[in-house]
């Protein structure tokens, strides 16, 4: 039996063992996996999907997904740093209707804009982040400047204190997700970033979701030892609209399961620039990130991030130049990190939030102890993820 077949057989046996649900077993397996070994033999790599001649044994068939090429003009795609839709490659998985995977459709250098936005702009007030629980507004407002000095230091040692950016775990945009109640509300809203909204609208439209409105975003900031627990994104009031996911930085393993946790998940790589869309049947499936993978060559950037932004950008471009100084900070951070943006439409068109009784005591939505992005270095003990979440 070859190493690939042996790895798949081992996973099938593991998932079938009693006492623990299949998803949890495979989550634990991949969390402890060794990059570069047969441990990752059953992980789908969509960046190589066009080269695959036959599916891996025991792994769902990868199929091409037809995009709506004429729905997004080349000019609108270029405005947000995307290739023309005609050049994108989009895939689905048999058994997962509504799941769409688009391997890096960004123009050379344009990922840098979105990385800078996540680290420098979106992390600022009035947006909400995990640091708000323990710091004043003035302290978190200086997140970028403080981190810039620390990350640009040539003396990078294990003893140096972590920058605020390295302590950042999540940021919420638009309608701010309440980690305690697992709800959104009309009275906790700040304007959604216009550039990210336009990017999301173009991707959604190309995938057949005309009229998508970006109303809420959750940005997760992963270190190499971070994981994202098993969960379902069900808090939005309109599940007919897709959930969009954008990844930048180091690669990660993503697990896509079923409606119940006793269904074994499918594993896939998420590389820098990759976009995932969860819609239809796949919109409410269990999913998780058990592992962020270190670069095989050490603390290096993915190759696609080595290319600088073009010297001249279109006059109407939403992609902005990134200074050498700013990119130095971003690059230092991303050598051992990953950033993920998820964008959602919360309400159906014309829908309002339901009226609810006013609670006497309002609990703090910025409590980082309630975030399901697990950081083993955090001094705050996180609550166990509700199995029904």
Curated annotation (Swiss-Prot):
Pfam families noted in UniProt: 2OG-FeII_Oxy_2
Fe2OG dioxygenase domain segment(s): 213-347
Superkingdom, natural source: Eukaryota
Its job: Dioxygenase that acts on nucleic acids, such as DNA and tRNA. Requires molecular oxygen, alpha-ketoglutarate and iron. A number of activities have been described for this dioxygenase, but recent results suggest that it mainly acts on tRNAs and mediates their demethylation or oxidation depending on the context and subcellular compartment. Mainly acts as a tRNA demethylase by removing N(1)-methyladenine from various tRNAs, with a preference for N(1)-methyladenine at position 58 (m1A58) present on a stem loop structure of tRNAs.
Reaction(s) the record says it catalyses: an N(6)-methyl-2'-deoxyadenosine in DNA + 2-oxoglutarate + O2 = a 2'-deoxyadenosine in DNA + formaldehyde + succinate + CO2; 2'-deoxyribonucleotide-(2'-deoxyribose 5'-phosphate)-2'-deoxyribonucleotide-DNA = a 3'-end 2'-deoxyribonucleotide-(2,3-dehydro-2,3-deoxyribose 5'-phosphate)-DNA + a 5'-end 5'-phospho-2'-deoxyribonucleoside-DNA + H(+); a methylated nucleobase within DNA + 2-oxoglutarate + O2 = a nucleobase within DNA + formaldehyde + succinate + CO2; an N(1)-methyladenosine in tRNA + 2-oxoglutarate + O2 = an adenosine in tRNA + formaldehyde + succinate + CO2
Residue pairs linked by disulfide bridges in the UniProt entry: none
Main location: nucleus
Residue sites binding 2-oxoglutarate per the record: 220-222, 338-344
Keywords: Dioxygenase, DNA damage, DNA repair, Iron, Lyase, Metal-binding, Multifunctional enzyme, Nucleus, Oxidoreductase, RNA repair, Transcription, Transcription regulation, Translation regulation
Protein's GO biological process: cell differentiation; developmental growth; DNA repair; in utero embryonic development; negative regulation of neuron apoptotic process; neuron migration; neuron projection development; oxidative RNA demethylation
Gene designation: Alkbh1
Matches recorded under InterPro entries: Alkb, AlkB-like, AlkB-like_sf, Oxoglu/Fe-dep_dioxygenase_dom
The keyword Oxidoreductase belongs to this UniProt entry's keyword annotation: yes
Cofactor: Fe(2+)
Protein name, as recorded: Nucleic acid dioxygenase ALKBH1
Subcellular location: Nucleus
Region feature tRNA-binding, mapped onto this chain: 86-389
Residues binding substrate: 144, 175-177, 233
Quaternary structure, from the entry: Monomer. Interacts with DNAJB6.
Organism: Mus musculus (Mouse)
Region (Interaction with DNAJB6): 1-127
Annotated positions binding Fe cation: 231, 233, 287
Phenotype of gene-disrupted mutants: Deficiency results in 80% reduction of the litter size due to embryonic lethality. Surviving pups exhibit a gender bias in favor of males (70% males and 30% females). Intrauterine growth retardation and placental defects. Altered expression of trophoblast lineage-specific genes. Increased N(6)-methyladenosine (m6A) DNA. No effect on H2AK118 or H2AK119 methylation, suggesting that Alkbh1 does not act as a histone demethylase in vivo. Cells show an strong increase of N(1)-methyladenine-containing tRNAs.
Cofactor note: Binds 1 Fe(2+) ion per subunit.
């Amino acid at each position: 039996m070859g190493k690939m077949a042996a790895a798949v057989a081992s996973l099938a046996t593991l998932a079938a063992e009693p006492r623990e649900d299949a998803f949890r077993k495979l989550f634990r397996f991949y969390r402890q996996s060794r990059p570069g070994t047969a441990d990752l033999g059953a992980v789908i790599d969509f960046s190589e999907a066009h080269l695959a001649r036959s599916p891996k044994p025991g792994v769902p068939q990868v199929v091409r997904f037809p995009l709506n090429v004429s729905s997004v003009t080349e000019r609108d795609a270029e405005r947000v740093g995307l290739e023309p839709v005609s050049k994108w490659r989009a895939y689905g998985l048999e058994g997962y209707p509504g799941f769409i995977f688009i391997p890096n459709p960004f123009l050379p250098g344009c990922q840098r804009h979105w990385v800078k936005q996540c680290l420098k702009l979106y992390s600022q007030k009035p947006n909400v982040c995990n640091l708000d629980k323990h710091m004043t507004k003035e302290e978190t407002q200086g997140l970028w400047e403080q981190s810039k000095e620390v990350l640009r230091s040539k003396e990078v040692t294990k003893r140096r204190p972590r920058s605020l950016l390295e302590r950042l775990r999540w940021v919420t945009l638009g309608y701010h997700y309440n980690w305690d109640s697992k709800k959104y509300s009309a009275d906790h809203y700040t304007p959604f970033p216009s550039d990210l909204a336009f990017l999301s609208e173009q991707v959604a439209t190309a995938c057949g979701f005309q009229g998508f409105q970006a109303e809420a975003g959750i940005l997760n900031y992963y270190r190499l030892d971070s994981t994202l627990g098993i969960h379902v994104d069900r808090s939005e009031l309109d599940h007919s609209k897709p959930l969009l996911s954008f990844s930048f930085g180091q690669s990660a393993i993503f697990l896509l399961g079923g409606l119940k946790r006793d269904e074994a998940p499918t594993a896939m790589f998420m590389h820098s620039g990759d976009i995932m869309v969860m819609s239809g049947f796949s919109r409410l499936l269990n999913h998780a990130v058990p592992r962020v993978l270190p670069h095989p060559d050490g603390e290096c950037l993915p190759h696609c991030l080595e290319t600088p932004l073009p010297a001249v950008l279109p006059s109407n471009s939403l992609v902005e130049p990134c200074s050498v100084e700013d990119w130095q900070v971003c690059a230092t951070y991303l050598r051992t990190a990953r950033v993920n943006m998820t964008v959602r439409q919360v309400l159906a068109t014309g829908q309002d939030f339901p009226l609810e009784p006013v609670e006497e005591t309002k609990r703090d939505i910025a409590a980082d102890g309630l975030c399901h992005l697990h950081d083993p270095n955090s001094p705050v003990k996180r609550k166990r993820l509700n199995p029904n979440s």
